Amino acid sequence: VKVVNQPLRKKDAMQLVTGQPVYVDDVTPRDCLCVKLLRSPHANAIVKSINKTAAMKVPGMEAIFTWEDVDQDGRRYTQAGQTYPEASPYDRLVIDRHVRFVGDVVAILAGADEKCVDKAMKLVKVEYEVLEPVLDFHTAKDNPVLVHPEDNWESLAPVGADNRRNLCAHDECGNGDIDAVLADCDVVIDRVYHTQACQQAMMETFRTYCEIDTYGRLHIISSTQIVFHTRRIVANALHIPKSKVRVTKPRIGGGFGAKQTAGSAVYPAFVTWMTKKPSKIIFSRVESQIASSPRHEMEMHVRLGANKDGIVRGIDLHTLSNTGAYGEHGPTTVGLSGHKSIPLYGKAEAFRFTSDVVYTNHMSAGAYRGYGATQGLFAVESAVNELANILGMDPFKIREMNITHEGEIMPAYYGQLNTSCALDRCLARVHDMIDWDNKYPCRDMGNGKIRAVGMGMAMQGSGITSMDVGSATLKVNDEGFYTLLIGAADMGTGCDTTLAQIAAEVLECPLDNITTLSADTDWSPYDSGSYASSTTYVTGKATEKCALELRGKICALGAKLLGCDKEQVSFDGREVRVEEGENAGKTINLSDIATASMNGNSIELQATVTHSSEISPPPYMVGAAEIEVDTETGEVTLLDYAAAVDCGTPINPNLTRVQAEGGIAQGIGMTLTESVTYDDRGYPMENSLFQYKIPARVDIGKIRVEFENSYEGEGPFGAKSIGEVVINTPLPAISDAIRNAVGKRFYELPITPEKIAMAALEKK
């Protein structure tokens, strides 16, 4: 390989670091309607009346839309970016008379500028009938208070949903007789773990610009991971034909799953469609904190059984998930809590995985990197660490005895074959990187501080089997350079670069010879979007196949121009050469072939390929943390984090490494500081980055990432995914290190200094 597995610079790097205008607010007009949302101060209420008379008298105000402008009996929609028919229920209206959380939309205001809209918003008078909210997700199921009592609530997929029970989803699956196996085990770990809701906290908040184009269609320019899904979502919300909607995306200032939900597009789309005037919405940081789509709060009851020799024989997991006021991604995230944690332990004779996803009057949850696997892995990996403690075994050793291996069937992973796996090598690599034998479990530093280590494993997937679709179009232009058209959305991950690397490898050309254009529903080939760790594996494979097809067409036209058969020529990326026959040795360069294709030619130098996969090969990761705990204050200092990742072949080692480092940093925040909490009225407490504590550079210590490459035969050049698996190991690793330092295991995140200090006092 010459281009793949090379640490090449991102194509857009210079534009980003020099501050060029590349984001939504940079590339869209300022002289458009400013759109803002009046939001509910109540967790559960009915809007009795809205008086907008005074507000509309403010100079510059264009329109104020309320529930009276939306058919309350019309078909509902979901904002979840998922393939149709979505697993997420259709439970939203653009503006609903029934508001279901603090921050839900009461009115859409549009005016000439932000100043007049802000003034008008203060003059809108709303009368509410305040209802009792459901705030505790433990009591939501079959609660007499219904979050969605409406008759036009709809579930399109068989996910066990029932709005009359506050159930967004329910599922049960298993293999073997788990109760009999657990009854026969020498040791059973029976614990309940709780993970909090967390914000993605991307730098660029939700934002969308809308206009009516030359053909009278709605053109949406949005910071989104899902242009094709957004087209469907907006069409469903506005009850207009999809042919009337075009969605494009510029650069994205971070997404991490938040922008797999169309959280902002619907509202300016509604304004522009109604007024026929361009409009723009930019969420404030407060709005992105109180009305976005954070990680699902989950509670996991784990029963893990083993023999006294450390062999894990059975895992029983029940997950309760809080989807909040609306069901975006609720039915799908919960599945990963079991199906991306239990399969790590290949020796288990039986498993059972059950789940409930419930509605509450909290902010609607959504997609966040890790997508449910993060929560489940914290629970299962913590249980395995506790098992090691009880048996007096080394946590690395107990995993070496139990892990899945290449070539094994994984019953808890939908019965899929483990086609590529370097998990054993990842374990050995991290064991040495962290110097485990000399540091485990802890060392008293003699100054009131204790240093300790902990570890954990993780897996994820590479796209959604038999569902995700990736496509690529490649064409040859004048002078022989290429254009790569994709529907995947580069949200900082670098897929515009890595997909071009795959094409360049096949076409044997420098990376700069390929121009990447992405994510426009009018001219991009269809792509499900950038989520579910699918882009490299699914769209990357489409790109590889597309480049191979185009290469064949180049050879065919070159052979025609050279007067021989296609089978007689070769192509080295620069020229087509006749290898045999009477014209052997004759050549024609790519530039001349490209020029000839534009004059009297019937062989199109363009190819489009679509790809979907029947398997989703997991990437694997092992992580180990070294921390220092101040036993008096409870402060945790992360000294070192060592990780080894099996993502198959890294297409671009630089981008792969920073993906891993960023994911680890987010996992550190979830473990130690980040949390979405509410007061007893359902009001969110962390409405800014002062209250919501994401880790700064000084908080994450030294992060070291290395790679143990397997080779996935179904992936492009052996590649699997990288984007999500990297967030999962800090939770069990750091929490286990804290246990080793202070002698108490914490079952609820985040583990704050206050919790540790209180535990130390209780111990004394």
What does each model-identified segment do?
Residues 74-79, 120-123, 222, 231-233, ...:
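Short acidic, glycine/serine/threonine-rich loops at helix termini
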Residues 147-238, 403-481, 623, 685-706:
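Helix-loop-helix junctions that connect adjacent transmembrane helices in secondary transporters/permeases
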Residues 1-160, 274:
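Flexible, low-hydrophobicity surface segments
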Residues 462-524, 539:
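Catalytic phosphate/nucleotide-handling subdomain of diverse soluble enzymes
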Residues 232, 253-276, 280-283, 495-503:
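Thiamine diphosphate
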Residues 67-68, 239-244, 274-279, 308, ...:
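C-terminal catalytic domains of large/alpha subunits in multi-subunit enzymes
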Residues 85, 97-98, 241-249, 273-284, ...:
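Conserved catalytic cysteine-centered active-site region
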Residues 6, 12-15, 82-85, 161-208, ...:
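Glycine-rich loop/linker segments at domain edges
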